[in-house]
UniProtKB/Swiss-Prot annotation:
GO cellular component terms given for this protein: cytosol
Segments of skewed composition (Basic and acidic residues): 1-12
Positions of the UniProt region annotated as Disordered: 1-35
Leader sequence segment: none
UniProt protein name: DNA-binding protein MmarC5_1518
Keywords (A to Z) from UniProt: DNA-binding
InterPro entries reported for this sequence: DNA_bind_arc, PDCD5-like, PDCD5-like_sf
HAMAP family per the UniProt record, alphabetical: dsDNA_bind
GO molecular function, one term: DNA binding
Entries under SUPFAM superfamilies matching the protein: Double-stranded DNA-binding domain (SSF46950)
Superkingdom to which the source organism belongs: Archaea
Length: 118
């Protein structure tokens, strides 16, 4: 077999696999999307209750810049609010301090390089 035939065969196999996965159960995919939407709506409702307007806008800006960090912050806020450890509504100043603490906890360890000269 020449390399072109091998590439064609692999391409066909990959396309067949993608079609099988896509056509497996569209109903299950639709339900998963619905559940995801429900989850997001509920999360936004809780965040509206616990954050002030300024804090919400700050979180929205963070979400644009660092979506993964914002998701982590949202989960932390929800957990703390459910445990009753947050003042409601959360002011922007308090939120800034909380962001600093969360960032410090999740920041990778700073590596130091020392050069020894002989």
């Amino acid at each position: 077999m020449n390399p072109e035939e091998i590439r064609q065969r692999r391409l066909q196999e990959m396309q067949a696999k993608a079609q099988e996965q896509g056509a497996e159960d569209p109903e299950a995919q639709r339900q998963a999307q619905e559940q995801q939407m429900q989850y997001e709506m509920q999360k936004q409702k809780i965040l509206r209750q616990i954050l002030s307007e300024d804090a919400r806008s700050r979180l929205a800006r963070i979400k644009l810049a660092k979506p993964q960090f914002a998701e982590h912050v949202e989960m932390q806020l929800i957990q703390l609010a459910q445990a009753g450890k947050l003042p409601v509504p959360l002011t922007d100043e308090y939120f800034k301090g909380l962001l600093d603490r969360i960032y410090e906890m999740n920041r990778p360890a700073k590596k130091e390089i020392t050069i020894m000269r002989k």
